[in-house]
Structures are given as C-alpha cells and as structure tokens.
From Swiss-Prot:
Protein name: 1-(5-phosphoribosyl)-5-[(5-phosphoribosylamino)methylideneamino] imidazole-4-carboxamide isomerase
GO cellular component labels: cytoplasm
Source taxonomy: Bacteria, Pseudomonadati, Pseudomonadota, Gammaproteobacteria, Enterobacterales
Gene: hisA
InterPro entries found in the cross-reference section: Aldolase_TIM, His_biosynth, HisA_bact_arch, Isoase_HisA-like, Isoase_HisA-like_bact, RibuloseP-bd_barrel
Key words, A-Z: Amino-acid biosynthesis, Cytoplasm, Histidine biosynthesis, Isomerase
MF (Gene Ontology): 1-(5-phosphoribosyl)-5-[(5-phosphoribosylamino)methylideneamino]imidazole-4-carboxamide isomerase activity
Claim: Cytoplasm is one of the keywords in the record: yes
Similarity field: Belongs to the HisA/HisF family.
Compartments it resides in: Cytoplasm
HAMAP family: HisA
Reaction(s) catalysed (UniProt annotation): 1-(5-phospho-beta-D-ribosyl)-5-[(5-phospho-beta-D-ribosylamino)methylideneamino]imidazole-4-carboxamide = 5-[(5-phospho-1-deoxy-D-ribulos-1-ylimino)methylamino]-1-(5-phospho-beta-D-ribosyl)imidazole-4-carboxamide
C-alpha cells in the first residue's frame, strides 16, 4: 500500500529535514491536499501532529478530527504525534482514525503501552521505531523526535511488543527521512524476513518510482511517502501503479 504522509505544524503541512524543527518547509493548509491525495487513489493517509509530538498541550485536535471526517469513508487515517495515554488512543479511534501510531512512549513506558495492546485491538496500534543504522548488527532506537539515542536495539523493541500481539510497525532510518536520498532497502528486507507476521511500513527517502518495486519486493506492507509527493517528484497515481504492477 502507498501511504502519503502529511506532517502538520500550526495548521500547515510541513516537511522536516531529518526531523529538525529548525529545518522545515511549509506546504500550506492540509484539507485540500488531503482531498487531492484521496482523489488520486490513496486508501490510507499517515497524519503526524508535530505540535502535539513536541507538546501534548498543543495538540491540533480540532484539525485532526476535521481531517479524519474529510477522509472517511474513502480513505483511512493513521495518526501519530503526542499520544501519551490510553484516553488519547480512545478519543482518536472514536473520532474515526483507523490506526494510532505510538512512538517514544512505547520505548520509555513499555509496561503501560503493553497494556494498551491488551485493551485495544492490536490491529489499531502501530509501533513507530526510528533508528540510527550503524551496521546490520547495530541499529539503535532514537526517541523524542530523534533528539535522544537509546541503548535499545531495533530487534529488542520489536520482540518486546511481539509478545503482546504487535501487528504493525513503521520503521524509519533517520539518515534517510525527508532527504529524497533513497530508501534503505536492505534494512526492510532484513526485518521483513526476521518477522514475517508483522506488517512493516517503510518510511523515509523514497525519491523515484523504481524504489517502490524494490521496497515491495523487500516484503513491506506499506510505503510512507511525504516529500516526493509534496514536491511532485511523481504522483500518487504513478506510485500506486508501480506498487500494483510489482
């Protein structure tokens, strides 16, 4: 599945270069673009509330609810940014979101988040893992918008949640995100082979249509694409065709 990404700060779509709030490009208001992405055939949109991710008190709740309503029933919404408790998850699911993305909190408070996997349908929860890749044996998890690197390895965090029914994982190679420098195909091939029952989504760096067929061949269930669509490197329609023709 091709999953367009919309990252939102202060009501506008932005792209951050390698996660830096200081290096952002503004692409205007999100509703018309969301409608255009759906018109082109997007069946799922990946929304990130970057204000909420930075400060839960600044979550853009009204705008997020509006975007979810605009998308339903033609497209599903996968939403992340500032999820801090079970109530946040519940409210978003009740408002019509299909999947809720859990990032840093899944790393810092695993005991609490594992209970969410028992309380909610695990199909509605997505573990987002951002990693620094030093080698195939050394892939360290980063948290808090990539500002802090942990000693935790990628496989450790996946195994932790695999025991409670983990179904969906977004894995981002930090060095690629927002760069249009190409995807880390070997990373996705490796993790899809290691955990065949998990639906992995690749994230970061896609810069040409030929990469889509390579990523699909790696075993990923979805490809999150942000900047390439915003800058018209290729269209959603073209990307979907590449995915379907693989």
């Amino acid at each position: 599945m091709i999953i367009p990404a919309l990252d939102i700060i202060n009501g506008n779509i932005v792209r951050l270069y390698q996660g830096s709030y200081c290096m952002q490009t503004n692409y205007g208001e999100p509703i018309s673009l969301l409608k255009e992405y759906i018109r082109q055939g997007a069946k799922m949109i990946h929304l990130v509330d970057l204000d909420g991710a930075k400060n839960p008190l600044k979550r853009q709740s009204l705008l997020i609810s509006q975007l979810i309503k605009e998308a339903n029933p033609l497209s599903k919404i996968q939403i992340g940014g500032g999820i801090r408790n079970a109530s946040d998850v519940e409210i978003l699911l009740e408002s019509g979101a299909t999947r809720i993305v859990l990032g840093s909190i899944a790393v810092t408070q695993p005991k609490i988040v594992k209970k969410w996997f028992e309380y909610f349908d695990p199909n509605t929860l997505v573990l987002a893992v951002d990693i620094h890749v030093y080698s195939e044996e050394n892939r360290k998890v980063a948290i808090y918008g990539w500002q802090k690197e942990t000693d935790l390895q990628l496989e450790q965090i996946i195994e932790e949640y695999y025991t409670v029914g983990l179904k969906h994982v977004i894995c981002t190679d930090i060095s690629k995100d927002g760069t249009l420098l190409g995807s880390n195909i070997s990373l996705y091939r490796s993790i899809c082979h290691a955990w065949p029952r998990i639906a992995f989504q690749s994230s970061g760096g896609v810069n040409k249509l030929s990469e889509i067929s390579k990523l699909r061949s790696s075993g990923v269930a979805g490809i999150i694409i942000g900047r390439a669509f915003l800058e018209n490197t290729f269209t959603i329609n073209e990307a979907i065709s590449c995915w379907q023709n693989e």
